[in-house]
A protein has these predicted regions:
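C-terminal motif of bacterial Sec signal peptides marking the signal peptidase cleavage site
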Residues: 15-18
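Acidic/polar, low-complexity intrinsically disordered N-terminal segments immediately downstream
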Residues: 20-95, 105-108, 265-267, 281, ...
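Extracellular beta-strand-rich recognition modules
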Residues: 80-88, 97, 101, 147-158, ...
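Short beta-strand segments within Ig-like beta-sandwich modules, predominantly Fibronectin type-III
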Residues: 247-254
Length: 294
């Protein structure tokens, strides 16, 4: 009896899956219109839809949301620029903070790996605090552009003395790409995105503290010598995040219009990607609308 059940069920299952695969996907019949071509800043632009599609994705044409850059991951001729704020206080020890870059650090957080890597000291490219919060200024890292990633590190040195070892705070860290034409595109948009890891080479009681707003370290008087590193994740200096669209429709129900407000004047190429699809097939149409914001 069990054999007969299997013989009946298996053909039925085979039929089900073959039928599912044969379901034909049609191209979306989808169009977009606007009431006018020119709008004011902060005025809602209403896009009216006709036809239908399973999914619709919206690219508003602003920086970071351009359809033509949806697969872009690098930029030729870009200038990588590093910035951060520092605050060094308490204690009179000098030369306690260094800014370094490595092309060959293997990412292993131990003394041997850190020391085996070649670290280039670029501290002299930055303005460091002498007691109050100061900006590093814009640090050009163009000379480190190459195939493969780099790591950026802060190295802290404190000596066992009768005066406190200096306390350092690093905030507002960012690494951006200045693209041809002047657009600024993020590589590491903020300190929390740096993928920081720390390692104490000497003076294990003290180490870099990693928080979302800052990196900080310090020690009291008469404490053992300290050498502590905090290092970013691997960074590609010419890399950029692909531009992203906004999903405004899925299978949950129909959408007949969509409104968007622009904060800056300019001419925008707005793109809607309409898709019909399932796990076996996918068809799409792309609709463009030009709008001017004044």
């Amino acid at each position: 009896m069990k054999i007969r059940i299997y013989l009946v069920v298996l053909p039925l299952m085979s039929c089900f899956f073959s039928c599912s695969k044969s379901i034909e996907i049609s191209s979306p019949e989808f169009n977009v219109t606007v009431a006018k071509q020119t709008y004011n800043v902060n005025e809602a632009v209403e896009f009216k839809f006709s036809g239908s599609a399973d999914y619709v994705t919206f690219y508003d044409g602003s920086d970071g949301h351009n359809y033509e850059f949806r697969e872009r991951t690098s930029i030729e001729g870009a200038v990588p620029q590093l910035k951060f704020d520092s605050e060094g206080k308490f204690g009179t020890q000098v030369n306690t903070l260094a800014l370094l870059v490595s092309r060959n650090f293997n990412g292993q957080l131990n003394k041997e790996s850190i020391y085996d890597a070649k670290w280039i000291d670029i501290t002299d490219r930055a303005t460091l605090s002498a007691g109050t919060v100061v900006s590093s200024g814009t640090i050009d890292l163009s000379d480190f552009i190459q195939r493969g990633p780099i790591h950026i590190a802060f190295k802290y040195i404190g000596k066992n003395m009768a005066t406190p070892q200096k306390t350092w705070y690093i905030t507002n860290f960012s690494l951006n790409t200045l693209a041809p034409g002047g657009k600024v595109l993020p590589i590491v948009p903020d300190l929390a995105s740096g993928g920081w890891l720390e390692h104490s080479v000497a003076g294990d009681a003290r180490k870099w503290r990693i928080t979302a707003p800052n990196l900080y370290i310090g020690a009291n008087a008469n404490e053992p010598d300290n050498e502590d590193w905090v290092i970013t994740k691997p960074l590609q200096l010419t890399s950029v995040n692909p531009d992203a669209g906004l999903a405004i429709k899925d299978l949950s129900g129909p959408v007949t219009q969509y409104a968007h407000t622009y904060k800056e004047a300019g001419v925008y190429k707005v793109v809607f990607v309409a898709v019909n699809g399932n796990v076996y097939d996918r068809k799409q149409v792309v609709k463009e609308v030009m709008v001017t914001i004044k």
